Amino acid sequence: MQFNNKPLIGVVHLPPLPGSPGYKGELDEVIDRAISDAAKYQEAGFDAIILENYGDFPYSKTVGKETVSAFSVVANEVKREIALPLGINVLRNDCIAAYSIAYSIKADFIRVNVLTGVAFTDQGIVEGCARELAELRTRLPSRIDVLADVHVKHATHFSNFENALLDTIERGGADAVIVTGSRTGSEVDIQELITAKRISPVPVLVGSGVNPRNIKLFWRYSDGFIVGTWVKEGGRTINEVSIERATKLAKLVKSLREG
């Protein structure tokens, strides 16, 4: 991934996949929805997309083989239709599955929610997977970037934010870090974002709560934006992408780039 232009990354929230409680047995419908949302991001002028198994709640810490297989099929179909750089995030924290899928379809990056440290989540205690991921990257070398959350949302953290950020980079091997609010769609703490930008030797992305009202404030303190709630119909995460909202945000980003 290139971050010199502060990329706008759209989240494709997938409906339930095989292996999750909500799966209805229609993978073709999942594929159609994913391609439709991805195409809207592309038409709107976004710079990249990331696929996420958002519909698989309640989440497990890692996913089964059937989910990995189905996710790979969906991601490959999206890649065939969409020209944008593509990322993979496998909830809740399956970095091995995410990298494996990304490697198999030649995706560009993955997102890891807990790369280092410990997060107290609704799935219980989630531990970092940096060592396992580093070993896999050695066995399957590629140019896939690792974008890692620092104090990921929907979790409680007892570590110091600055130490957690530096550990994620220096000990976890993150190629970029992500700062989020406390929940999906919630705004980031501006002081945490400023701190991250000040001390991080790698790009810093805003990972939640981005909208036309606050992106101007975040612009100077970030190197990119991951957006998935405000750009949906009615601003609801589970809805389809709104081409009008996505276009509005993309045009605003373009104007900010132009100064």
UniProtKB/Swiss-Prot annotation:
Cited InterPro entries: BtpA (IPR005137), RibuloseP-bd_barrel (IPR011060)
Disulfide bonds: none
Pfam families noted in UniProt: BtpA
Transmembrane segments: none
Family: Belongs to the BtpA family.
Protein name, UniProt field: Uncharacterized protein PH1209
